[in-house]
């Protein structure tokens, strides 16, 4: 990614007034391609509009293409926001303590750029554990598509929905136990009903949770700048809690957090007083290279194209072992553990489903 692309991002998010030089027509085309790869077409269009006021304009046809894409993103956000509101209200009326996580919830921190963030699926954390979520799902829209932390819940034909009985996980079983204990400590009383009409977790939770989510995708599939930007807006618009430094150490996130802080400070312009820890430049530059390869959730990574899922995971793990050994080394053990976990809990799914057949 070029210096100019990061300048465009900074213009879009308000940490820069204009580009250091006006791009040529070809360079504008490259900027649009980078924005698409990183799933930032909508947010970057806000930068394009601001640059027009500075007389740094792009070719008309590209502008119209970009405008059309941004309009579609806005329309899609309206749909997904409404689905989040509807789903949360249904869960709430059913007596479940639920909060929308990630995606549309994090979008609330984007301010006026909220509707330009590219939406994805809907993730809802339902407190009460596996049995509570399982019984609700089998009673309403039955599903046996389960994992350690979530069910697929096929309630919308055009939007993927996951109901989480755990918000997230770590593959190191000891670290995961600590993480689950910490997640359990977040009470439904802390959930916040936002201006869009659905509940979301408190900022103190999101500041650690979103980092673990990005970390997991970075290790096992890849991340793009959209995920980095989510964390930028979250940190920019929230305040630190007293136990953050301890939690970073406890979950072995200090090195990755340092990499993220370098990237957010150097490339996004996040202020020093908003950083969650000290930046680590070497790790940050390594992270940036991986982001350049991967694109959004690793969809643009050509290095492992055509590999089986297992081989891709093995190759990527070997690639990252030196930097983040704990999660990588624990992966084979985790996969065996998860296989037996799924076997046991799928039986629970079928037993509950029989009750409502």
Where do the language-model regions lie?
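Conserved NTP-donor binding/palm subdomain of two-metal-ion nucleotidyltransferases/polymerases, i.e.
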Residues: 1-120, 125-357
């Amino acid at each position: 990614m070029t210096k100019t692309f990061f300048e465009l991002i900074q213009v879009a998010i308000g940490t820069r007034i204009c580009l250091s030089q006006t791009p040529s027509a070809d360079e504008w085309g490259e900027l649009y391609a980078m924005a698409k790869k990183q799933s930032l077409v909508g947010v970057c269009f806000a930068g394009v509009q601001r640059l027009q006021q500075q007389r740094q304009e792009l070719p008309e046809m590209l502008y119209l293409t970009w405008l059309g894409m941004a309009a579609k993103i806005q329309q899609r956000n309206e749909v997904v926001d409404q689905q989040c509101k509807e789903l949360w209200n249904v869960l709430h009326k059913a007596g479940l303590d639920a909060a929308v996580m990630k995606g549309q919830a994090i979008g609330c921190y984007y301010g006026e750029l909220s509707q330009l963030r590219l939406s994805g699926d809907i993730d809802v954390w339902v407190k009460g554990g596996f049995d509570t979520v399982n019984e609700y799902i089998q009673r309403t829209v039955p599903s046996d598509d389960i994992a350690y932390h979530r069910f697929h819940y096929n309630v919308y034909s055009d939007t993927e929905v996951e109901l989480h009985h755990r918000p997230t996980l770590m593959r190191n079983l000891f670290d995961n136990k600590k993480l689950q204990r910490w997640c359990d400590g977040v009470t439904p009383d802390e959930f916040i009903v936002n201006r869009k009409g659905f509940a979301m977790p408190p900022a103190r939770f999101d500041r650690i949770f979103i980092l673990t989510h990005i970390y997991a995708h970075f290790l096992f599939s890849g991340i793009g700048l959209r995920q980095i930007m989510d964390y930028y807006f979250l940190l920019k618009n929230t305040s630190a809690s007293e136990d953050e430094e301890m939690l970073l150490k406890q979950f072995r996130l200090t090195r990755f957090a340092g990499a993220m802080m370098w990237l957010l400070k150097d490339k996004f312009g996040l202020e020093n007083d908003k950083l969650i820890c000290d930046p680590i430049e070497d790790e940050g530059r390594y992270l940036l290279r991986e982001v350049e390869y991967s694109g959004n959730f690793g969809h643009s990574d050509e290095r492992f194209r055509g590999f089986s899922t297992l081989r891709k995971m093995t190759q990527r793990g070997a690639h990252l072992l030196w930097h983040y050994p704990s999660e990588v080394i624990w992966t084979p053990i985790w996969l065996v553990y998860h296989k037996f976990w799924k076997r046991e809990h799928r039986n629970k799914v079928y037993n509950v489903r029989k009750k409502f057949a």
